[in-house]
Amino acid sequence: MKLTCVMIVAVLVLTVCKVVTSDQLKKLRRECYLEPGDSCFHDDGRGACCEGTCFFGVACVPWS
């Protein structure tokens, strides 16, 4: 009985750790998917533009 309880707790702890780690990785990883000139209106501009930055939520502007 004790072994079953220990295994259940271990699975729950590992599941929680996996969810937390996955969420943190998503926040840390910045995947770009917009090219210069693409609209970034629906994006908050954090890491979406591959070469440049989101200019006031209008379009990706390349760094010069």
Curated annotation (Swiss-Prot):
Q: Give the UniProt entry's GO cellular component terms.
A: extracellular region
Q: Which GO terms describe its molecular function?
A: toxin activity
Function, as annotated: Probable neurotoxin.
The set of disulfide-linked cysteines is 32-50, 40-54, 49-60
Chief subcellular location equals secreted
Swiss-Prot/TrEMBL keywords: Disulfide bond, Knottin, Neurotoxin, Secreted, Signal, Toxin
Q: Where is the protein found, in the record's own terms?
A: Secreted
Q: In which tissues is it expressed?
A: Expressed by the venom duct.
Task: Give the signal sequence positions.
Answer: 1-22
Its domain comment says: The cysteine framework is VI/VII (C-C-CC-C-C).
The regions listed as transmembrane in this protein's record are none
Q: What is this protein called?
A: Conotoxin Cal6.24
